[in-house]
Structure formats: C-alpha cells, structure tokens
Amino acid sequence: MVERILNSEDISLLISGRQSNPHKLLGIISENSSQDRIILFRPGAHSVAVELQGNIEHATHHHSGIFSLTTPKGTLLNDYRIYHQNGLLAHDPYAFSPLWGEIDSFLFHQGTHYKIYERMGAIPCDVRGISGVLFVVWAPHAQRVSVIGDFNFWNGLVNPLRKVSDSGVWELFIPGLDEGTLYKWEIVSASGEILIKTDPYGKGFDVPPLATSRVINSDRYVWHDAEWMEKRSCTQDQPLSIYEVHVGSWQWQDGRPIGYRGLAERLAQYCKEMSYTHIELLPITEHPLNESWGYQVTGYYAPTWRYGSPEDFQFFVDHLHSEGIGVILDWVPGHFPTDTFALAHFDGEALYESVDHKEPLHPHWHTYTFDYRCNEVVNFLLGSALFWLDKMHIDGLRVDAVTSMLYLDYGRKEGEWSPNIHGGKENLDAIEFLKHFNFIVHKEFPGVMTFAEESTDFPKVTEPINSGGLGFDYKWNLGWMHDTFRYLKVDPIFRAYHHNDLTFSIWYAFKENYLLPLSHDEVVHGKGSLLQKVPGDTWSKFAHMRLLLSYQICQPGKKLVFMGGEFAQGREWSPDRSLDWHLLDNPYHATLHKCVAKMNSLYRDLPYFWQGDGKQESFRWIDFKDTENNVISYYRLSGNDSNQALLCIHHFSSGYIPSYVLHCQGIKMCQLLFNSDDIGFGGSGKGNRPPILCIDHGFSWGIDIELPPLATLIFLVRFSN
C-alpha cells in the first residue's frame, strides 16, 4: 500500500539504515485528493498506537517496521501523537519542517556562527508550542546519522536525522524529550562502518568513563552577578593576582574531591583571605582521563560532571563573582585526544583533525591537531570559547600550548612537516584562527581577558590585531620562570656566576604584556614541588620560598601561583589526591602562608605594583650589578605619582649584612612596608632597623639599611622635589 506513494529505493534505504532524508518518507504524506497517510517507521515493533484527534487508532503494519494510518485530508502535526515503545506519548518527529535555516548554514560554513552553541548539539526548545529537543550535528561524510538513547532503546534505525545542508548538517526535532535525556550519535560512514559517537557540541556528559551525552538547558540557571559583569573591565591597570586551581585536588572530603557547590564557598573565602583577585581553573571541559588534568578534551562545551552538573558549575562561578573573585578557564584549542568515541574521525573521515602532516599525531602528546583551514572546525572552536563566556560567565580564557599552534615544525623532525606557502614554519591558518578568536572575544565580551601560553619570541603576541599582533591581553613569561628557577637552584655561594639569570628577563619585560607564572607545569613529572627546587636546610628553604614569592610580586607583570605553592606543599602535585592542608599545622608552612597573604594584600592595594606595569616607565633599576652580595634593587613607579615609589631590594645570599649602602639619589623619606625575614613570617627578624638617609652637603645620595639573608625588603620612598 505505501509502495504506491513512496519510492521503493527510498524505502530500501530507510530500512537498511542509509536514508539521508527520512522526512520525505515519514510523517504526514499526501495520498490522494481526499486523504492523507501518516507513515511511521518502528523497526522491531509489532504494533503502533496513534492518538488521532483524541481517539486511539492502531496503525497498519506493512513490512520491516513500516506502519501507516489513513487520516483526513489536511491532517496537521498537532492532530496526532504517537505512543512510543518506551511508553512516551508525543508528537511525530517527522512531521516538522527543517529548523536549521539558510542563515545558519551560511554563517556556519563561513566560520562565523558565533551563537553556534544555541543551534548545534541537543537544544531543548519549543516548536509551534510543542516542547522537545532539537538534535543537530555536522557529519558531511556520513551516509546516515541517527540519535540514540533510552527513548528508542539505543536503536539507530528508529530516529535517523535529516540532512539539511549540502555541507553535511543533520537535524531532527524529537517532541517529548526533556533535559537530562541521555543520547549519542550513531553514524554510518561512507564505507558503511557504524560509529557510536558522543556529541561534539554536548553541554553535559555522564561521569567518565561512561561518555554519554546529556541534554542540558544552559539557560535555566538564574544568575545574580549582574553588578560584577557590568563592572569587570580590562585589567591592564588593575591588580591581577591569579590562584591556579585543579578542582579535583584542591580539597577532598570523605575520600573524594569537593564538588562545584561545596567548593564555591570554601574557595571564594580562601581567595579573599589570601587577597587573590582571580582563580584560574585547569581545564574543566569534559575529559575522559583524569591523568590528563583536563588537557585532553572530548567535551568542549561541557564542564566535567565529576564535580557536579553544569548548573552546579554556574553556581560556582556566580558565587565567586559575588565575593569579588574572577574566574579564568584554561582552554585547549590546539589538539584533541584520539578516543574513538569523540572527535577523532568523527564521521569515518578526518573531520576535525588536520591531515597536513605525514604523521597525524602530535609527537608530544600523541593527539590530533585541529584543522584551522576548515571553517566549520574554526566555528566549533570559536563557539566553544564564546559559550563559556556567554553561558558560564567566565572572565578570561588562557589558551594552552599556543606555541604548538603557531609553528608547523613544533615537536616534529625534518621531513615530518611541510612549510607554509611562503616556505616558512609558521602555521598561517592557526595564526589567523588566534586573531579571529581574540577579535571576537573582545568584541562580544569587553573586559574578558585572553592569555597565551607561548614559550618562544614569536612577535606581537599581545599587540592589537590592527597593529599586526595576535591580540592577546597577556602572554605567560615562561622565560622569566625558567631563568628564576635556574638561578634559585644554584647554591648561594655560586650565584655570583649566574647573576644574568636574575636580571636578563627585565631587558625584554616590556616587549609584551606579561604574566609571571609559577604554574602547575613546574611541580609535576619529577620536577618536584617549589619547596624541593630550592637549596639549603629547612629554614633556608622557607626563606627561599618567601624570597621567590615576594620577588614575583615585585617584578613587572601580572601574577599566577599554582595551588599549594602559597604554603609550600612538600611533595609534588598529583591530580589524584588533595593538597596537604595539614601542613598548615606546621609553623614553617603557616608563617609562609601568612607572608603570602600579606604580600598579596600589598600588591592589591599599592598601584605601584600594577599600574602601567607593562610599560618601561613603571620600572627603574637602582643596582643590578652587585654580584658580590647577590643583591638587586629597583623602583616600581606609578604613572599617577611621580613623587613616590616603591623601593624593592632582593638579597639572594645566605649571609646577614648589618649595614648595606644603596646608592639612590633624592630620597627624603624611606618607610619599610614589607620584610620577608620578619619573625611573624618565619624569618630571623633581621632587616627591621630604620633606614638611614645618606646626605652630603644637603644632598641625599643613598640609604643605609640592614639586609637580612635570603630576603626581600619593600620600602615606600618619597623623593625631594
């Protein structure tokens, strides 16, 4: 009977699971001038009941799961509902017109659909007054795409999607489904292979390792941070002291990590007590492997379910904002893992991954790199960034592994990479992507910060795009970090021969807008904790810690410290356990903790540390040549106050100097603000003697101070007119 109105080849494709346009066979089909016919496909069902205008009818079973029911001419989608095999009574998914429009296709295939997260994936919505979920996915090489879940007993033949774009977008609106529905994609590749995949645009996933997508309404949460969102602004001339956090190992309770909601209050209170302005989260985008720390992402639009739901994460951000703490997210657009359930060979072909290299896997991480030539891939990544800023109210994005994106030969040997069109090693497509990313982030979300983890001297990373730069707000100064650690590892007796490691970074400190990181990367993989990096006995180690952290505070650039560094975590960090908070019962750790809180509050309150700190005018050497005593000294200046400055002195040797004369002209007042050797901070109590002004014939030419071992002194000085 249905063969009279349907093409037999189309029926065969539907039954065999290779039909790309099921809507032309299913739903309401005009049979003749006097009647319509509802055609249903229920493979494996023996009967199908239909509620037609309030009456229960049973459809006729033809063969191979095809059912039909004759209806009056002009039957509409609201006139009937179907009893599904799971008991759900809902409207017919195949009676709806396409919801993915031409403008969607145009923008997506141009790579500029900046609200793509509201159009791709699983979107709870109402269509013509009927609630359900719109499923949309990009799979251009697929013969067939179906959505599978409990609602169809994970049978890929039941709910095939319609191909609505020549470039491979598929969609299906399923009425009656709601938030929390679990689903995956079943994809038939061009070769006929059946693939089961999670949703690239999924907003939630089951707790790993289950890797099942979950329908999420990202707009359900009611935010309370309007005041914060309105006033947040560019931090170039504001204090920026970042506490880097791995959510799963900051604090545990009852043998497991504290979830988003429980963590919110504790972490906000802690950051306030320690005077941190922001936290930076190691990636909480969904990831299957805990040991990857979140850097091998399979869910670019979803906070990991390990610590709670997306709504719990929204509460977490909201609460930190209410306490005046910003939230920065590590974001990984450079590479993705090879897990077969996710992005890798998504529709049976290389789709998201680049095929430019002879060896497709990146040699450092054995992951795929993204194809930045493909507009749809670019749109996927841009959409992820904008999703976190829009729906999750994130205040900044730190882009991981930028260097690996910028250079085609990064980690590759000769012959393993191909030069760009100019014969160079720069990845021109990745460079354009990063510019596009920074442009649209700053355009759509003024005040949001972007950070580049970039380890080479690639030019103009923080220059504006219209000046030829990449457009980042800040670049991690990894050179400063490595030089500092290399210097501090040397025994103080021999540091005179390594003085250049201490001073070199200042000569390029104003080339970019820098952030000075003491990050997680330096306390893993056998590198030891910060405490383990510095030499000496216990007292000397903690003196070194006070010196290191105060030196970081005083140097030009924004600040970042990985959790545990602020109280000298003793052992190397692991993502599989809590920090050793019990160490705060030890006076050494407790007094360092107190010292860091004091330093952070000074940094936050004194504009000399941060106002214009990306400009040469904010810094002036006093003496960088005292290799005999391992001392450097300099002024930190604020553009608004030329009559005063901070005088910072760092003593990197273990000897005590009761009288140290510093040649600094024109000082008429010198007040000690901070001494890292204070007894209250665990020090020896040296360095608190009031400074003596050195004056000849009424001319102030220097100061005489007491210089404690392994210590930082910070003075507020006032100059003569």
Swiss-Prot record:
Top-rank EC class of the record's enzyme: transferase
Active site residues according to the UniProt entry: D400, E453
Name of the protein this chain belongs to: 1,4-alpha-glucan branching enzyme GlgB
Name of the gene: glgB
Source taxon at top rank: Bacteria
GO term, biological process aspect, one: glycogen biosynthetic process
Record's keyword terms, sorted: Carbohydrate metabolism, Glycogen biosynthesis, Glycogen metabolism, Glycosyltransferase, Transferase
GO function terms (MF aspect): 1,4-alpha-glucan branching enzyme activity; cation binding; hydrolase activity, hydrolyzing O-glycosyl compounds
EC code: 2.4.1.18
HAMAP family, per the entry: GlgB
Function: Catalyzes the formation of the alpha-1,6-glucosidic linkages in glycogen by scission of a 1,4-alpha-linked oligosaccharide from growing alpha-1,4-glucan chains and the subsequent attachment of the oligosaccharide to the alpha-1,6 position.
Similarity-based family: Belongs to the glycosyl hydrolase 13 family. GlgB subfamily.
Subunit structure and binding partners: Monomer.
Key word Transferase present: yes
